[in-house]
Amino acid sequence: MEMILLTLIKTHGGDIKGYTKKKINYFLGIPYANQPINEHRFKHSKCLKTWNKTIEATSFKSIPPQPYNKLETFFSSHAQLFNQSEDCLYLNIWCQNNQYNNKPVIIYFYGGGFVNGHGSQELYTPEHIVARHDVIVITFNYRLGALGFLDWSYF
């Protein structure tokens, strides 16, 4: 039976709880900006700098609203249905479970023509990279389509 341990890290912004599995730390679904909903829908997001409660970063969160992508299903080993929501500004972090500092950081920007994609796609999860190399890998979601790129500032 595979052992999964909860992992708590303390940051300048607050505490984040993830988990460790097969010597890899996972911190999934960390909010990095305020929710871009309601009156904030077509405005620039505001960076989330601090939080009061521990962030439970143990599972992927909502992905940006987008049309169905047949290729994502084709390249997945199992059916994955992600909740789609305008509240989608989350990042995911993977790193080896060791105490070494000053690791290289890889930040992955997914493609999809600003219409499809998300930072939780199985095809791009970096466990194989992190297992072989002592690096930190970050994926994240960003707003797509009109919700991400329609500029209303002139109106």
PLM feature spans:
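Non-catalytic accessory segments of hydrolases
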Residues: 2-155
